[in-house]
Amino acid sequence: MNQTNFGFKKIKANEKQSLVNSVFSNVADKYDLMNDLMSFGMHRLWKDEFIRQIPNLNSNILDVASGSGDIALKLAKKAKDRGSNISLTLSDINEEMLRQAKKKSIDLNLFQNLKFTVASAEELPFPDNSFDYYTIAFGIRNVPDINKALKEAYRVLKPMGKFICLEFSKVKESLLQDFYKFYSFNVIPKIGKIITGNKEAYDYLVESIDLFPSQDEFRIMIKEAGFEEINYKNLSGGIVAIHSAYKL
């Protein structure tokens, strides 16, 4: 029987998605606040750097695992300020998270040109060769079958389309690595319990980060999905990395 990890726990592969859904449904209303607290606001700078990887906003963009919509709404605002003709599709398997994204888009008056689709990253309901860019930020490690999700990304991108992924990675500097591990396993779950009442959700978060492949290992996975011109850029000493590749 196929098994996979849910954090450090071994579970049946077909159980992971429902468990991940439960995690994010339980913390959806405090998700943005927790991101600020856990990263000391750094996630905003990481995401700003991430969207700089999309120079042409006159594009059809798919944002997968959109969550509360941070990436898509940053792109929508940038496009609105520039007068660009952007088309943005926000996709997430968790309906409650997409509900948060919709609410934010209305509050910020950025809902124009946005589409919202509840869908799995492993089975996207879009035709082949549909999008100029595929973005996914802090989401791919939560997908039960990452290789399948990467192949779906390749399928829905147009020829010359760009895949861009922002994800937690492996810290390179030993002193920072020691602090980061201590902070992740001893502090973040406690903050999560105080703010959301759900320590287990943040135990899963830090465990899933620890298990995610290294920069070079993930690069190989991207290549095996069919992508070329694969690169990554470490941010904050490798706490996170931006991975990019093209469908040629």
UniProtKB/Swiss-Prot annotation:
Keywords of this entry: Menaquinone biosynthesis, Methyltransferase, S-adenosyl-L-methionine, Transferase, Ubiquinone biosynthesis
Gene3D superfamilies, per the entry: Vaccinia Virus protein VP39
InterPro entries per the UniProt record, alphabetical: SAM-dependent_MTases_sf, UbiE/COQ5_MeTrFase, UbiE/COQ5_MeTrFase_CS
Positions bound to S-adenosyl-L-methionine: 68, 92
Gene this protein is translated from: ubiE
A single GO molecular function term of this UniProt record: 2-methoxy-6-polyprenyl-1,4-benzoquinol methyltransferase activity
GO biological process: aerobic respiration; menaquinone biosynthetic process; methylation
Class of enzymatic activity (EC top level): transferase
CDD domains: AdoMet_MTases
Family recorded in the similarity comment: Belongs to the class I-like SAM-binding methyltransferase superfamily. MenG/UbiE family.
EC number: 2.1.1.163, 2.1.1.201
Function: Methyltransferase required for the conversion of demethylmenaquinol (DMKH2) to menaquinol (MKH2) and the conversion of 2-polyprenyl-6-methoxy-1,4-benzoquinol (DDMQH2) to 2-polyprenyl-3-methyl-6-methoxy-1,4-benzoquinol (DMQH2).
Catalytic activity: a 2-demethylmenaquinol + S-adenosyl-L-methionine = a menaquinol + S-adenosyl-L-homocysteine + H(+); a 2-methoxy-6-(all-trans-polyprenyl)benzene-1,4-diol + S-adenosyl-L-methionine = a 5-methoxy-2-methyl-3-(all-trans-polyprenyl)benzene-1,4-diol + S-adenosyl-L-homocysteine + H(+)
Name the UniProt record assigns to this protein: Ubiquinone/menaquinone biosynthesis C-methyltransferase UbiE
Protein's UniProt keywords contain Transferase: yes
Pathway linked to the protein: Quinol/quinone metabolism; menaquinone biosynthesis; menaquinol from 1,4-dihydroxy-2-naphthoate: step 2/2; Cofactor biosynthesis; ubiquinone biosynthesis
